[in-house]
Amino acid sequence: MIVNGLGLGSFMRRSGSGNSNRASASASASASASTLLPTSSKMDYVKLQPRIGSTFPPPHRTQLPPRFHSSLTSGGLPPGAGRSACHRNWWILIPALLLLFFFFLFFTLSGQFSAKISPVQNYKYGIVIDAGSSGSRLHVFRYTAEGKMPSVDTAGGDKLSLKSKPGLSSFATSPEKAGKSLLKLLDFARQKVPEEERAKTKLYLMATAGLRRLDLKIQDAILDSCREMLQRSGFLFRNEWASVITGTDEGLFAWVAANYALGTLGGDPDETAGIVELGGASVQVTFVPRLLPPEEFLIKLELGGVTYKVYTYSFLNLGQEAAWEALLQLLFTRVVRTSLPSASDGVVVDPCTPPGYVMSEEEIHRRSTKFGTTSELEISSVLSAGNFSECRSAALKLLQMGREACTYERCAIGSTFIPELRGRFFATENFFYTSEFFGLPATTSLADVEAAGRHYCAESWSKLQEIHKGIGQEDLLKYCFSTAYIVALLHDSLGVAMHGKRMHFTNRIDNVPLDWPLGAITVKLAQENHQRPALSRLRDSFITIFSFLVLGAITTQCSFRLKAIMSSGEVPLTS
């Protein structure tokens, strides 16, 4: 502090010289008094008090013994004490602030560079059970959580996943047995996760369309059975982590998985790819559109510091198996008729099954009962026609059902809004399995899919069985319908060009499986990482505030000490 060009030390030095002069005068006065008064008549200084209304001023401090000096001065500090005390405080403050600075610097840099400087990755683990309609698949993920985006180790691939059958939905009549179906999967997980990490490894069970189609009470009963088993697994599990996820979640997770594999997350949203999944029970369409869709179709997702505005929708009962079953029902109930001739009204013409296949009477009766066929529409036989064009037309009618209720500008499937597709897309699951069966490359066109389907549908059933001896009957039956359904869905409904290369039929990107569980664990970890910077900011704010409080406290203390010294008369206010 500088006053009138003089530093704090100048004031303290001037105060010290004044005090010494006054002290000498006081000593002389005391000596004179002691020679004039006898000991018995000396003034009792203890009882000396100023009288109220007295015209005499109170005694000067030099008239009092030293023990009274502290009671009549503010702080009673000796000359130079304020300066030395403040100096001592500053010598304490400077190392403290330096220590706080290095503490802040260490934690900031360690969070950014620890993964780079450490030769050994300290992996953490997470587990996701995909409880699908045909079976349950367990995925073990290894990851590190440094940076804005988690780093999931995808090198393990299939070695870190295992599938078991049947699916949880098959326990609808005996839900209490569902939990035991997970034993094999949990044993597999224990082999992959180190023992010391198991209690810290989060375990999620996410059921999809297979369980979504069941009654809510049955869903809860099946999940409760699974929860009991998962609680005893040795992994970190909470009851709410076993749930039936929505089709929207499933589509979003698949989109995250695809773009994580591409390395586009955390960058420009327009550079991301879209994804269309053809599952067994449902279809998911997810991508970042050019224009914002209606609010009910929009999801805002923050990943890597970037907010993505994603369109996603799940079409329940339009997955490959569910759609085929639904189409047969439409044929059996005459809701959909083909232009192909039939021998009689009791004969159903099936354009999606290769010619020569004969449906047994038991199968016809089962389907007639299931579909609620009336006696007037009693089915005597099913004629397998194997006609690609008619099958495609029937599939399109199925996809367009309910379009008359559309209230949006554009309804591509039923009465549901779908924006115009943009950018590249990945067609996964049954899209890929069908293209793989026909030996088509990932960049195949829909025209190639159509050509393969036409040839397959027209081939006799006996010839197909002879050519594909290693494939089961149920699988062979579906490929005529599958090719026609793919063209009806992607071209006739979503507007994908027949000869374009926009669609990539694959389940992998750079050997990374495009499984939605990868997206699910990525989103979960990103949410946890999003909370960590908030805690880091809170820590940094605490350090800053604490530093200012220490500085303020010492400065205030020095200020009060200086004022006390000045008010006591030790420091002259004028030179």
Predicted region positions:
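Membrane-lumen (extracellular) interface motif
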Residues: 107-121, 266-268, 563-564
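Helical "lid/coupling" subdomains associated with nucleotide-phosphate turnover
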Residues: 2-38, 44-55, 80, 126, ...
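Hydrophobic alpha-helical cores of multi-pass transmembrane domains in eukaryotic membrane proteins
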Residues: 96-103, 131, 548-552
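Membrane-embedded alpha-helices of multi-pass membrane proteins, especially ion channels
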Residues: 100-114, 136, 140, 553-561
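Helix-loop boundary elements of multi-pass alpha-helical membrane proteins
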Residues: 69-95, 123, 563-574
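A short acidic Gly-Thr/Ser loop motif
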Residues: 121, 129-137, 276-282
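N-terminal Lys/Arg-rich, disordered targeting/topogenic segments
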Residues: 26, 48-86
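Beta-propeller domains
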Residues: 147-156
